[in-house]
UniProtKB/Swiss-Prot annotation:
Organism in which the protein naturally occurs: Homo sapiens (Human)
Locations listed in the record: Nucleus; Cytoplasm
Keywords on record: Cytoplasm, Disease variant, Dwarfism, Ectodermal dysplasia, Hypotrichosis, Intellectual disability, Iron, Iron-sulfur, Metal-binding, Nucleus, S-adenosyl-L-methionine, Transferase, Tumor suppressor
Main localization (coarse): nucleus
Organs and tissues of expression: Expressed in heart, brain, placenta, lung, liver, skeletal muscle, kidney, pancreas, spleen, thymus, mammary gland, colon, small intestine, testis and ovary. Reduced expression in primary breast and ovarian tumors.
Disease as annotated in the protein's UniProt record: Developmental delay with short stature, dysmorphic facial features, and sparse hair 1: An autosomal recessive syndrome characterized by intellectual disability, short stature, and craniofacial and ectodermal anomalies including scaphocephaly with or without craniosynostosis, prominent forehead, sparse eyebrows and hair, hypoplastic toenails and, in some cases, dental anomalies.
The protein's enzyme class: transferase
Subunit and interaction comment: Component of the 2-(3-amino-3-carboxypropyl)histidine synthase complex composed of DPH1, DPH2, DPH3 and a NADH-dependent reductase. Interacts with DPH2. Interacts with RBM8A.
Protein's name according to its UniProt entry: 2-(3-amino-3-carboxypropyl)histidine synthase subunit 1
Length: 438
């Protein structure tokens, strides 16, 4: 699946005026010309790539041609970089554009780097492997971003058999994953709903079943187990932190192993509360704005600044793409740091820093804007978040169409809303969710 992000002005009117020269929403994915879709040379070139990885090459070529792009930047996580040269060759062969690969580390959707792409002279950015989480700055009408989710097909038969051998019938299961496996996850949910009480929870603006390392839904009390489809534990730990009382399982689609997973909630929370307690006696604060792509939120930074000013606390601002203990040790006069980048950096690695390294939520607790929450909130990009120390706080309160759920609410059986007006043509609009079976 892919999503195209364009400037607001260009999308609303274009050269032909408002509403003209634009196809109805939901039909964009079907507009790829047959001379691209059925091009035998292109089909042969695509076969070099793994058949179970959907890089959406025809759509990418069509979008580049539509935009008349001259220089295209590709951004992808390190796990996909081995395919970058092949994709460059294909795109340069079938378009008129010059294509380059951005090699800086890309941890997630928050790292989409349109700033660097523009600085390098690109007029089109293709971001692979993540969903359209960050609305783009619409001030530049000559720059476009295409998100390619890189849907990965796996052996669902083995997954289903593993679940059936592990859980008795009628067990209430919640299924979650990363964006690459969401379509497989929802197909599996449809297969299981006749035997189990299956839910695919949604934490808007994410897709149904999608979780991030910093954002996961709170599950209903009826859920007896949560199953994560994916490799590694980073995303799984997010939903485990948000739901400490729900047994968690991980199905690795590569090793084909279903395992019971555990997390030391007591140790993590004790470490974070100790950091908060130390911060309450701090005289000098340091505010770090992450500059790795769009990771940092200026809105959150401004909120923190206003709170510190109101309390008469001194602070210094620091812009960093990567946050290391050795870097922060160069400013010994700072008593406590608050990083507006990735909450998991503090949660997972906070004890490695000599001074407290707080998340914006933890800073709010230290400043007594909110009490310590149980369970620990994983709502950094959720629309229905706790407060202005999160990215999308208040989006669920905006007016919405009658009969449609407000953004940010956890819903069953609803399709993903666009992250912004610019994402209206996102093909994930057609995703389905398996509701909780009776």
């Amino acid at each position: 699946m892919a999503a195209l992000v364009v400037s607001g002005a260009a999308e609303q009117g274009g050269r032909d005026g408002p509403g003209r020269g634009r196809a109805p929403r939901g039909r964009v994915a079907n507009q790829i010309p047959p001379e691209i879709l059925k091009n035998p040379q292109l089909q042969a070139a695509i076969r070099v790539l793994p058949s179970n990885y959907n890089f959406e090459i025809p759509k990418t070529i069509w979008r580049i041609q539509q935009a008349q792009a001259k220089k295209v930047a590709l951004q992808m996580p390190e796990g996909l970089l081995l395919f970058a040269c092949t994709i460059v060759d294909i795109l340069e062969r079938f378009t008129e554009a010059e294509v380059m690969v951005m090699g800086d580390v890309t941890y997630g959707a928050c790292c989409v780097d349109d700033f660097t792409a523009r600085a390098l002279g690109a007029d089109f950015l293709v971001h692979y492997g993540h969903s359209c989480l960050i609305p783009m700055d619409t001030s530049a009408q000559d720059f476009r971003v295409l998100y390619v989710f890189v849907d990965i097909r796996i052996d669902t038969t083995h997954l289903l058999d593993s679940l059936r051998l592990t859980f008795p019938p009628a067990t209430a299961l919640a299924l979650v994953s990363t964006i690459q496996f969401v379509s497989t996850l929802q197909a599996a949910a449809q297969e299981l709903k006749a035997e189990y009480r299956v839910s695919v929870p949604q934490c808007k603006p994410l897709s149904p079943g999608e979780i991030l390392g910093c954002t996961s839904p709170r599950l209903s009390k009826e859920v007896e187990a949560v199953v994560y489809l994916g490799d590694g534990r980073f995303h799984l730990e997010s939903v485990m932190i948000a739901n400490p009382n729900v047994p968690a399982y991980r199905y690795d689609p590569y090793s084909k192993v279903l395992s019971r997973e555990h997390y030391d909630h007591q140790r993590m929370q004790a470490a974070r509360q100790e950091a908060i307690a130390t911060a309450r006696s701090a005289k000098s604060w340091g505010l770090i704005l992450g500059t790795l792509g769009r990771q940092g939120s200026p809105k959150i930074l401004e909120h923190l600044e206003s709170r510190l000013r109101a309390l008469g606390l001194s602070f210094v601002r620091l812009l960093l793409s990567e946050i290391f203990p050795s870097k922060l040790s160069l400013l010994p006069e700072v008593d406590v740091w608050v990083q507006v980048a990735c909450p998991r950096l503090s949660i997972d690695w906070g004890t490695a820093f000599p001074k407290p390294l707080l998340t914006p939520y933890e800073a709010a607790v230290a400043l007594r804007d909110i009490s310590w929450q149980q369970p620990y909130p994983m709502d950094f990009y959720a629309g229905s978040s706790l407060g202005p120390w999160t990215v999308n706080h208040g989006q669920d309160r905006r007016p919405h169409a009658p009969g449609r759920p407000a953004r940010g609410k956890v819903q069953e059986g609803s399709a993903r809303p666009p992250s912004a007006v610019a994402c209206e043509d996102c093909s994930c609009r057609d995703e389905k969710v398996a509701p909780l079976a009776p």
